[in-house]
Every structure is written in C-alpha cells, then in structure tokens.
C-alpha cells in the first residue's frame, strides 16, 4: 500500500539523537517507523492504548493521600497555569506539568531554557512520540516520578498541561478530578492550534468546566469553587 499524506510530526521534527536523549523508551519505535516511512510505506496502525495500570505503590499512595490534588485541562493559553498558581496562593502546594519530565529532558538536550512558542512544534513532536508509545505515557511519567512522591509527603498537588481525554480518565482512576478550562477568544488561527494536543478536548464534556471569558478576578472566583 502506498503511503498518503504527511509523516507524523515526530518523524518530521526529531532525529535519532534527539529521541535517544529525550525519550529513549521510544527509540526503537522511532527508528522502525522512520525507516518504514523513508522506504515509501505508510506507518503501521497502532492502537496506542495504555495498559491503564500504574504500579501498585502508586494506587496505595492515591488511596491514602492527604490534602488536595486537582488537575486543569485546556488549550494553550486557556489559563491552566494561572489556575494552578492561584490555588497554590490560596492553600499552598506544588504545581506539576504533565510533561515536566519531558521538558527537563528537552531542556538538557537543547542546553537552554525552553522558549514558547519557538519550541512548541518541537515539544509537540516529542509529546506525539510518547503517546505513540503509550496513550498515557506522559501523565503516567508525571504521576510515578513526581506526583506520587509528593503524595507521600502530604503535599497539595495541582496538575497543569492535561490535553487528552485518556489523560483525564487516567487521573480519575487515581481519584484525581480534572477541570477543563475553555477560553474561546484565545484562538488566532495559528497552525499550532490545529495540532491534536490542542483540539482533542474541544468536544469533550465528561468533566467539570470553567469558562475563562471575563476578568482575571472572575476567573479566579470560578477556580476557587473547586478548592476545599
């Protein structure tokens, strides 16, 4: 079968050197699919489904965790980080980005801080490759390496950067509620806004929502309704 369309973002934007440094777990998959594409064949189908399981110790901590853990989902610029920062200003805690581990690896590889929007296509490609390996690769990484250790210390945790229904469901499986923030007026027509990580939640309706369409004070008031 002849291939059609454009290659996946990670084949266009990444190299074996980048993948081995930033997301080595996906290196064999990346090499295989890159060779497949360069030979003129379509990328094989992949169910891209997570096993849906964390290690048992994560479930144990989730069941016994103290304090508040709340996640925020939405498009870029919708107010996810501001919501987390506001919550922390009110009750204390730590902010965790779903992609924090990937960001740290990418920063180390680039040898400089991440710059948005300059580096967004690069980050989107890394995100795509991780999710090609496992639909919940990044949220699982954040929970197991960053969030769960915070639970063991009784810290309030506020999670930003949630972009996909599968991530919301994975968090719900640990008793973590996600609030979806919608901010219609941020759309500018940029190609980056059409990336799957920006559109995946457009029609999603299975979690609480906040409309960020007024003043900062009004937005913070709406966020506060989800705090204890």
Swiss-Prot record:
Which protein, by its recorded name, is this?
Uncharacterized protein ORF77
| Matching Gene3D superfamilies | P-loop containing nucleotide triphosphate hydrolases (3.40.50.300)
Q: What is the lineage of its organism?
A: Viruses, Duplodnaviria, Heunggongvirae, Peploviricota, Herviviricetes
Tell me which domain of life the UniProt entry assigns to the organism this sequence originates from. Viruses
InterPro entries, sorted: P-loop_NTPase
């Amino acid at each position: 079968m002849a291939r059609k369309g454009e290659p996946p973002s990670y084949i266009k934007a990444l190299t074996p050197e980048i993948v081995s440094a930033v997301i080595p777990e996906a290196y064999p998959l990346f090499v295989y699919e890159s060779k497949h594409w360069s030979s003129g064949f379509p990328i094989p189908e992949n169910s891209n489904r997570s096993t849906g399981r964390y290690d048992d110790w994560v479930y144990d901590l989730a069941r016994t965790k103290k304090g508040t853990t709340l996640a925020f989902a939405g498009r870029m610029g919708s107010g996810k980080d501001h919501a987390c920062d506001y919550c922390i200003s009110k009750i204390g805690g730590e902010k965790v980005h779903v992609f924090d581990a990937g960001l740290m690896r990418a920063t180390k590889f680039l040898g400089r801080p991440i710059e948005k929007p300059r580096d967004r296509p690069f980050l989107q490609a890394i995100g795509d490759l991780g999710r090609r390996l496992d639909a919940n690769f990044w949220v699982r990484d954040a929970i197991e390496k960053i969030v769960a250790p915070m639970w063991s210390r009784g810290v309030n945790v506020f999670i930003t950067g949630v972009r996909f229904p599968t991530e919301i469901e994975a968090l719900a499986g640990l008793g973590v509620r996600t609030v979806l923030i919608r901010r219609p007026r941020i759309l500018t027509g940029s190609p980056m806004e059409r990336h799957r990580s920006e559109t995946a939640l457009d029609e999603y309706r299975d979690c609480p929502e906040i409309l960020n369409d007024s003043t900062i004070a009004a937005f913070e008031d709406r966020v506060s309704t989800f705090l204890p």
